[in-house]
C-alpha cells in the first residue's frame, strides 16, 4: 500500500516513558484500528520527558489530526478503541477526508 493512499495512524510517546503498559494499550488499540481500516501504523518516540501518549491521523503531507490523548492513569484498551472509533467517525464527515467517508461502515464496526 502506498503511504499516502488512505493515511496512517501515528502514536506519539516519550522514549523515557516508564509505564510501558499504558503505551502498549494505546498502541495495540491504534494498530488494531489501522489494520481494520487498511491504514499504515507507526509509533513515533520523542526525547521529552512527558507522560502523555497521543494518537494522530495523518493523510499524505497534511498536518496530523489529533484523535486521542492519554494523560496518565489507568488505560483500558476498549476505551481507547471506542475513543478512536468516535473520532475517526467524526472525521469521516469532513470533506477533506473522503477516504474516511468511504470507510465509515468499517469505522463503526471497529471495537
Question: What are the residue ranges of the model-derived segments?
Answer:
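Auxiliary Fe-S-binding modules of radical SAM enzymes
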Residues: 28, 44-46, 108-110
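Local sequence-structure signature of Cys/Sec-based thiol-disulfide redox active-site neighborhoods
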Residues: 1-37
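Intrinsically disordered, low-complexity segments enriched in small/polar residues
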Residues: 2-5, 45, 58, 70-71
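Non-catalytic, surface beta->alpha helical segment in thiol-disulfide oxidoreductase systems
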Residues: 58-104
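Hydrophobic beta-strand residues in large extracellular and virion-surface proteins
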Residues: 9-11, 30, 41, 53-57, ...
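Cysteine/selenocysteine-centered motifs that mediate thiol-based redox chemistry or coordinate metal-sulfur cofactors
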Residues: 1-9, 94-111
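Generic detector of low-complexity/intrinsically disordered segments
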Residues: 4, 39-41, 69, 86
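Short, intrinsically disordered low-complexity segments
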Residues: 39, 43-63
Amino acid at each position: 500500500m502506498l503511504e499516502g493512499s488512505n493515511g496512517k495512524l501515528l502514536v506519539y510517546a516519550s522514549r523515557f516513558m516508564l509505564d510501558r503498559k499504558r503505551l502498549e494499550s494505546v498502541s495495540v488499540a491504534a494498530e488494531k484500528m489501522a489494520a481494520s481500516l487498511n491504514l499504515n501504523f507507526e509509533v513515533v518516540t520523542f526525547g521529552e520527558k512527558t507522560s502523555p501518549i497521543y494518537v494522530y491521523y495523518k493523510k499524505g503531507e497534511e498536518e496530523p489530526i489529533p484523535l486521542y490523548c492519554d494523560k496518565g492513569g489507568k488505560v483500558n484498551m476498549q476505551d481507547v478503541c471506542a475513543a478512536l472509533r468516535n473520532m475517526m467517525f467524526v472525521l469521516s464527515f469532513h470533506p477533506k477526508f473522503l477516504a474516511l467517508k468511504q470507510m465509515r461502515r468499517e469505522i463503526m464496526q471497529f471495537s
